[in-house]
A protein has these predicted regions:
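Mature-chain termini and adjacent capping regions
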Residues: 1-178
Length: 178
């Protein structure tokens, strides 16, 4: 049982950490002003260690953004979020998922992998295990996918099996000449 002060601390810590972690990934959108909702079977927060862990059918939403995972770990140092790690097994698919609807300035994003890691300071998104990232109509698929959000650079790696090659589908933009 979580006592009242522990529950308040958990809620406060969760809101601070999630507002720090979600805004850099999503850039400034109208969703940033919407409430952050967290649903999970269990939550553990250690303010001293800068770690919070949500487990069991985790659903995190804010506006058009949604994270689905079996477990989400948030790590911070000096009250600054450093790492977000989402691990799969959502509805037994084995994959963690992230979606964000399109905005006026940004295309929609859908990502899934066995493990999704985001390093906040360097804006590095890494998908490991059956990695798929859709950015608008473009699709990137591989065993490991690294995306430097600030620089717009993708790096994909194939799996061990020769048939497990990287796969990219890039559609021409309507306003770009062929």
């Amino acid at each position: 049982m979580i006592f009242s002060t522990e529950r308040q601390s958990l809620i406060r810590w969760s809101a601070v950490v999630l507002s720090l972690c979600l805004n850099p990934v999503l850039a400034a959108t109208e969703s940033d002003r919407e409430p952050i909702n967290i649903q999970a079977d269990r939550a553990m927060v250690s303010e001293l260690d800068g770690l919070s862990v949500y487990s069991g059918h985790v659903v995190i939403t804010q506006g058009s953004m949604k994270i689905l995972a079996d477990e989400v770990r948030l790590k911070s140092e000096n009250n600054q979020l450093t790492t977000i790690l989402a691990v799969g097994d959502v509805a037994q698919s084995g994959l963690a998922g992230f979606t964000r609807g399109a905005t006026r300035d940004l295309e929609s994003i859908t990502a899934s992998a066995s493990e999704v890691e985001y390093l906040v300071a360097s804006q590095q998104l890494t998908l490991r295990g059956q990695a798929v990232l859709s950015l608008g109509q473009d699709r990137y698929q591989g065993n490991v996918l690294s995306y430097d959000i600030a620089k717009g650079i993708f790096k994909l790696e194939s799996g061990q099996d020769p048939s497990d090659r990287v796969n990219l589908t890039i559609n021409p933009k309507a306003d770009q000449p062929l």
